[in-house]
């Protein structure tokens, strides 16, 4: 269920001859901490898991998993993709037990094209490319200072209000779920206890791209999955036990603190209108 930015790295490692163990959700659509810990053995040197799934909002039990792994296998390097969780759900680098944490600016109102990698003290990593001495010699090339400054400003603005925004956006998620529950042709693909910032639903009988184009005409812009895999069928939903038919009609609704219940009302009204018009056409 990992993002392509991580998944493709491990695919390349596998092509180079490394053994890669991939963990899929169980029949209940869950990945437990036991699943993650049991995948590690004496030959493992790297574990990488996302904190929040970018298509469904599912939250993985990283803190408990990595805490146990570090006790059993202290030399294993742990990485966590926190792009969908940073400034949205509480993250404590001390208790997360991740040696490496990757975050990105474009998910938190910062400029696109800027991110950061947290490296725990004592963790040794190789240079990502050769050249100058920028970024402590890890990544050469002239830094995009406006982007970096914008990312820093976003952190300063949004970090103090993580809890308040989480509670508010949780109310929006609840409002949306209640609003669509009266329509048996809309299926909820996200779990109730996942991140409130992402809700994945399926409009039965209508392919994602058709509904998305209809919503665009109403100035409502959502997506059918990961923006990095536009036009490609999602394999993530299938991993969570969602059928091919529902996956083909899945759309992802993403919230932020500036959204309101009026936005949700407009979305649901448009879904109803689109459902009636598209199926009759």
Regions found by a protein language model. Give the residues of each.
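Pyridoxal 5′-phosphate
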Residues: 1-281
């Amino acid at each position: 269920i990992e993002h392509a930015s991580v998944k493709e790295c491990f695919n390349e490692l596998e092509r180079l001859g490394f053994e890669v163990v991939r963990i899929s959700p169980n029949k209940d659509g869950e990945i437990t901490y036991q699943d993650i810990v049991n995948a590690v053995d004496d030959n493992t040197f790297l574990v990488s898991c996302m904190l929040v799934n970018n298509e469904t909002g599912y939250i993985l039990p990283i803190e408990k998993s990595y805490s146990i792994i570090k006790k059993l296998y202290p030399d294993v390097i742990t990485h966590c993709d926190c792009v969908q969780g940073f400034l949205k759900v509480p993250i404590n680098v001390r208790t997360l037990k991740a040696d490496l944490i990757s975050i990105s600016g474009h998910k938190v109102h910062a400029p696109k094209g800027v991110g950061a990698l947290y490296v725990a003290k004592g963790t040794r990593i190789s240079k990502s490319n050769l050249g100058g001495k920028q970024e402590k010699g890890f990544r050469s090339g002239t830094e995009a200072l406006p982007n970096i400054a914008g990312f820093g400003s976003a952190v300063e603005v949004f970090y103090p209000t993580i809890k308040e925004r989480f509670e508010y956006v949780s109310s929006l998620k609840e409002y949306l779920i209640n609003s669509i529950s009266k329509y048996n042709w809309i299926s909820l693909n996200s779990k109730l206890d996942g991140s409130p910032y992402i809700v994945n639903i399926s409009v039965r009988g209508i392919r994602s791209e058709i509904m998305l184009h209809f919503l665009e005409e109403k100035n409502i812009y959502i997506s059918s999955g990961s923006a990095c895999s536009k036009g490609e069928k999602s394999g993530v939903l299938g991993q969570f036990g969602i059928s091919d038919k529902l996956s083909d009609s899945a759309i992802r609704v993403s919230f932020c603190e500036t959204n309101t219940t009026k936005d949700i009302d407009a979305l649901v009204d448009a879904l109803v209108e689109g459902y009636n018009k598209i199926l009759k056409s």
